[in-house]
From Swiss-Prot:
Has antimicrobial activity. The keyword Secreted applies. GO terms for biological process: defense response. Expressed by the skin glands. It comes from the Eukaryota. Belongs to the frog skin active peptide (FSAP) family. Phylloseptin subfamily. GO terms for cellular component: extracellular region. Keywords: Amidation, Amphibian defense peptide, Antimicrobial, Secreted. The modification Phenylalanine amide is found at residue 19. It is found in: Secreted. This is Phylloseptin-J1.
Length: 19
Protein backbone atom coordinates (compact mmCIF):
# COMPACT_ATOMS: atom_id res chain seq x y z
CA UNK A 1 0.00 0.00 0.00
CA UNK A 2 2.84 2.38 0.83
CA UNK A 3 4.26 1.84 -2.63
CA UNK A 4 0.95 3.09 -4.05
CA UNK A 5 1.10 6.47 -2.28
CA UNK A 6 3.98 7.95 -4.36
CA UNK A 7 2.13 6.91 -7.51
CA UNK A 8 -0.99 8.74 -6.37
CA UNK A 9 1.06 11.83 -5.50
CA UNK A 10 2.72 11.68 -8.91
CA UNK A 11 -0.68 11.44 -10.61
CA UNK A 12 -2.05 14.39 -8.64
CA UNK A 13 1.10 16.36 -9.39
CA UNK A 14 0.74 15.62 -13.10
CA UNK A 15 -2.90 16.73 -13.07
CA UNK A 16 -2.02 19.90 -11.15
CA UNK A 17 0.77 20.58 -13.63
CA UNK A 18 -1.71 20.19 -16.51
CA UNK A 19 -3.90 22.92 -15.05
Amino acid sequence: FLSLIPHAINAISAIANHF
